[in-house]
Design a protein with these regions (language model features):
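Conserved catalytic scaffold of divalent metal-dependent phosphoesterases
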Residues: 9-11, 62-152, 216
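Active-site neighborhood of phospho(di)ester-bond hydrolases with catalytic His/Asp-centered motifs
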Residues: 5-7, 25-30, 54-60, 76-78, ...
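Short, structured coil segments at secondary-structure junctions
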Residues: 21, 50, 71-73, 85, ...
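Active-site environment of divalent metal-dependent phosphoester hydrolases
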Residues: 10-14, 32-38, 60-67, 82, ...
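N-terminal active-site segment of His-dependent metallophosphoesterases
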Residues: 1-52, 120-124
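Binuclear metal-dependent phosphoesterase catalytic core
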Residues: 83-85, 154-160, 173-216
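Catalytic phosphate/metal-binding cores of nucleic-acid and nucleotide-processing enzymes, i.e., regions
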Residues: 3, 17, 38-41, 46-48, ...
Protein backbone atom coordinates (compact mmCIF):
# COMPACT_ATOMS: atom_id res chain seq x y z
CA UNK A 1 0.00 0.00 0.00
CA UNK A 2 1.23 3.49 -0.86
CA UNK A 3 0.14 6.43 1.30
CA UNK A 4 0.79 10.10 0.62
CA UNK A 5 0.72 12.47 3.59
CA UNK A 6 0.43 16.25 3.36
CA UNK A 7 -0.14 18.87 6.03
CA UNK A 8 -0.33 22.62 6.62
CA UNK A 9 -1.84 23.66 3.29
CA UNK A 10 -2.99 27.04 4.66
CA UNK A 11 -5.26 27.45 1.64
CA UNK A 12 -2.49 26.69 -0.86
CA UNK A 13 -3.90 23.64 -2.60
CA UNK A 14 -2.98 24.16 -6.27
CA UNK A 15 -0.35 21.40 -6.15
CA UNK A 16 -2.71 18.74 -4.79
CA UNK A 17 -3.61 17.41 -8.22
CA UNK A 18 0.11 17.23 -9.12
CA UNK A 19 0.82 14.70 -6.39
CA UNK A 20 1.57 11.17 -7.62
CA UNK A 21 -1.13 8.54 -7.45
CA UNK A 22 -1.50 6.61 -4.21
CA UNK A 23 -3.81 4.14 -2.52
CA UNK A 24 -4.64 6.70 0.18
CA UNK A 25 -4.09 10.41 0.74
CA UNK A 26 -3.94 11.62 4.35
CA UNK A 27 -4.17 15.31 5.25
CA UNK A 28 -2.78 16.38 8.62
CA UNK A 29 -4.69 19.61 9.08
CA UNK A 30 -4.39 23.36 8.65
CA UNK A 31 -6.42 23.27 5.47
CA UNK A 32 -6.86 27.03 5.97
CA UNK A 33 -5.19 30.09 7.47
CA UNK A 34 -7.69 31.14 10.15
CA UNK A 35 -10.42 30.19 7.66
CA UNK A 36 -14.10 29.33 7.87
CA UNK A 37 -15.90 26.03 7.37
CA UNK A 38 -16.59 27.22 3.83
CA UNK A 39 -12.86 27.75 3.30
CA UNK A 40 -12.18 24.19 4.47
CA UNK A 41 -14.85 22.97 2.04
CA UNK A 42 -13.15 24.83 -0.81
CA UNK A 43 -9.83 23.10 -0.14
CA UNK A 44 -11.60 19.75 0.14
CA UNK A 45 -13.12 20.39 -3.28
CA UNK A 46 -9.59 20.47 -4.70
CA UNK A 47 -8.59 17.38 -2.74
CA UNK A 48 -11.56 15.44 -4.08
CA UNK A 49 -10.45 16.07 -7.66
CA UNK A 50 -7.94 13.29 -7.00
CA UNK A 51 -8.97 9.67 -7.64
CA UNK A 52 -7.53 8.29 -4.40
CA UNK A 53 -9.56 8.22 -1.16
CA UNK A 54 -8.69 10.70 1.58
CA UNK A 55 -8.70 10.67 5.38
CA UNK A 56 -7.92 13.74 7.46
CA UNK A 57 -7.77 15.66 10.71
CA UNK A 58 -8.07 19.42 11.19
CA UNK A 59 -5.29 21.74 12.34
CA UNK A 60 -5.20 24.50 14.90
CA UNK A 61 -5.82 27.15 12.20
CA UNK A 62 -9.03 25.44 11.06
CA UNK A 63 -12.39 25.96 12.78
CA UNK A 64 -13.22 23.08 15.13
CA UNK A 65 -16.77 23.09 13.72
CA UNK A 66 -15.33 21.78 10.42
CA UNK A 67 -15.06 18.35 12.09
CA UNK A 68 -18.72 17.94 11.15
CA UNK A 69 -17.80 18.55 7.50
CA UNK A 70 -15.14 15.83 7.60
CA UNK A 71 -17.67 13.49 9.21
CA UNK A 72 -20.25 14.25 6.51
CA UNK A 73 -17.68 13.39 3.84
CA UNK A 74 -16.70 10.18 5.67
CA UNK A 75 -13.06 11.18 5.91
CA UNK A 76 -12.53 12.17 9.55
CA UNK A 77 -9.97 10.44 11.75
CA UNK A 78 -10.48 12.72 14.75
CA UNK A 79 -10.85 10.50 17.83
CA UNK A 80 -11.88 7.69 15.52
CA UNK A 81 -10.18 4.44 14.63
CA UNK A 82 -10.59 3.35 11.03
CA UNK A 83 -9.16 0.63 8.86
CA UNK A 84 -7.78 1.02 5.37
CA UNK A 85 -5.85 -1.59 3.43
CA UNK A 86 -5.56 -3.71 6.55
CA UNK A 87 -3.94 -0.87 8.53
CA UNK A 88 -5.53 0.62 11.66
CA UNK A 89 -5.52 4.43 11.84
CA UNK A 90 -6.45 6.86 14.62
CA UNK A 91 -6.35 10.64 14.58
CA UNK A 92 -6.26 13.78 16.71
CA UNK A 93 -7.18 17.14 15.20
CA UNK A 94 -6.32 20.61 16.46
CA UNK A 95 -3.26 21.21 18.62
CA UNK A 96 -2.10 21.76 22.17
CA UNK A 97 -2.16 25.35 23.39
CA UNK A 98 0.02 27.93 21.61
CA UNK A 99 0.92 31.54 22.53
CA UNK A 100 -1.13 32.73 19.55
CA UNK A 101 -4.70 31.89 20.60
CA UNK A 102 -5.45 30.01 17.38
CA UNK A 103 -8.96 28.72 16.58
CA UNK A 104 -8.61 25.03 17.42
CA UNK A 105 -6.53 24.47 20.52
CA UNK A 106 -6.95 22.17 23.48
CA UNK A 107 -5.20 21.59 26.78
CA UNK A 108 -3.22 18.37 27.11
CA UNK A 109 -5.28 17.36 30.14
CA UNK A 110 -8.53 17.98 28.26
CA UNK A 111 -7.38 15.91 25.27
CA UNK A 112 -6.21 13.13 27.58
CA UNK A 113 -9.73 13.05 29.05
CA UNK A 114 -11.27 12.94 25.56
CA UNK A 115 -8.99 10.07 24.62
CA UNK A 116 -9.90 8.21 27.79
CA UNK A 117 -13.58 8.58 26.90
CA UNK A 118 -13.12 7.45 23.29
CA UNK A 119 -14.25 3.90 22.63
CA UNK A 120 -11.92 3.82 19.59
CA UNK A 121 -8.78 4.56 21.58
CA UNK A 122 -7.79 1.01 22.44
CA UNK A 123 -6.07 -1.99 20.94
CA UNK A 124 -3.37 -2.28 18.31
CA UNK A 125 -2.67 0.73 16.12
CA UNK A 126 -0.63 1.03 12.94
CA UNK A 127 -0.81 4.75 12.09
CA UNK A 128 -1.43 7.74 14.34
CA UNK A 129 -2.34 10.95 12.50
CA UNK A 130 -2.02 14.03 14.70
CA UNK A 131 -1.71 17.64 13.63
CA UNK A 132 0.34 18.27 16.77
CA UNK A 133 3.60 16.30 16.94
CA UNK A 134 4.55 14.25 20.00
CA UNK A 135 6.51 16.25 22.54
CA UNK A 136 10.29 15.71 22.38
CA UNK A 137 10.02 13.66 19.18
CA UNK A 138 12.18 16.02 17.12
CA UNK A 139 9.20 16.81 14.90
CA UNK A 140 8.19 19.49 17.43
CA UNK A 141 11.40 21.58 17.61
CA UNK A 142 10.98 25.27 16.86
CA UNK A 143 13.78 27.59 15.74
CA UNK A 144 15.17 28.21 19.22
CA UNK A 145 15.38 24.48 19.93
CA UNK A 146 12.40 24.30 22.26
CA UNK A 147 10.14 21.25 22.10
CA UNK A 148 6.54 22.45 21.77
CA UNK A 149 4.68 19.26 20.87
CA UNK A 150 1.89 17.61 22.80
CA UNK A 151 2.66 15.48 25.83
CA UNK A 152 -0.70 13.78 25.43
CA UNK A 153 0.20 12.74 21.88
CA UNK A 154 3.58 11.51 23.13
CA UNK A 155 1.88 9.49 25.87
CA UNK A 156 -0.49 7.99 23.30
CA UNK A 157 2.41 6.90 21.11
CA UNK A 158 4.16 5.33 24.08
CA UNK A 159 0.98 3.54 25.14
CA UNK A 160 -0.35 2.26 21.81
CA UNK A 161 3.03 1.89 20.04
CA UNK A 162 2.06 2.62 16.44
CA UNK A 163 4.91 1.98 13.99
CA UNK A 164 4.08 5.22 12.14
CA UNK A 165 3.13 8.71 13.37
CA UNK A 166 2.13 11.38 10.84
CA UNK A 167 2.11 14.99 12.07
CA UNK A 168 2.59 18.59 11.00
CA UNK A 169 2.09 21.96 12.72
CA UNK A 170 5.76 22.85 13.28
CA UNK A 171 6.90 23.99 9.84
CA UNK A 172 10.60 24.29 10.62
CA UNK A 173 10.79 20.73 11.99
CA UNK A 174 10.13 18.97 8.68
CA UNK A 175 11.85 15.60 8.69
CA UNK A 176 11.67 11.95 9.65
CA UNK A 177 12.41 11.03 13.25
CA UNK A 178 12.50 8.03 15.58
CA UNK A 179 10.47 8.23 18.79
CA UNK A 180 9.29 5.49 21.16
CA UNK A 181 9.81 2.84 18.50
CA UNK A 182 7.81 4.79 15.90
CA UNK A 183 8.75 6.52 12.68
CA UNK A 184 7.54 10.12 13.12
CA UNK A 185 7.01 12.06 9.89
CA UNK A 186 6.56 15.82 9.57
CA UNK A 187 6.55 16.73 5.86
CA UNK A 188 6.54 20.48 6.49
CA UNK A 189 4.03 22.90 4.97
CA UNK A 190 2.55 21.73 1.66
CA UNK A 191 2.95 25.10 -0.06
CA UNK A 192 3.13 25.86 -3.78
CA UNK A 193 5.94 23.30 -4.19
CA UNK A 194 3.76 20.46 -2.92
CA UNK A 195 5.87 19.04 -0.08
CA UNK A 196 4.67 15.59 0.94
CA UNK A 197 5.68 12.32 2.55
CA UNK A 198 5.44 9.04 0.69
CA UNK A 199 4.92 5.86 2.66
CA UNK A 200 5.21 2.41 1.09
CA UNK A 201 3.95 -0.31 3.40
CA UNK A 202 3.67 -3.75 1.77
CA UNK A 203 1.63 -6.46 3.44
CA UNK A 204 3.65 -8.49 5.89
CA UNK A 205 6.16 -5.75 6.71
CA UNK A 206 6.27 -4.45 10.27
CA UNK A 207 7.41 -0.95 9.30
CA UNK A 208 7.03 1.15 6.16
CA UNK A 209 9.58 2.73 3.86
CA UNK A 210 9.14 6.50 4.19
CA UNK A 211 10.64 9.50 2.41
CA UNK A 212 9.97 13.20 1.81
CA UNK A 213 9.51 14.74 -1.63
CA UNK A 214 7.89 17.60 -3.49
CA UNK A 215 5.78 17.48 -6.63
CA UNK A 216 6.78 20.84 -8.14
Amino acid sequence: MRILFISDLHGQCSAVTALPKADLLIVGGDFTQFGSVEDVAAVLHSVHKRPDPCLAVLGNLDPETANALLDEQDMSLHLQQRQFGGRRLFGIGGANATPFNTPYEWGDDDMAAQLAASHSNAGPLDILVSHAPPRNSGADRIGNGSAVGSQTVADLVQRRLPPLVLCGHIHEAAGIYAFAGAIVVNPGPFGPQGHYACIDWPDGQNAPATWLAQCR
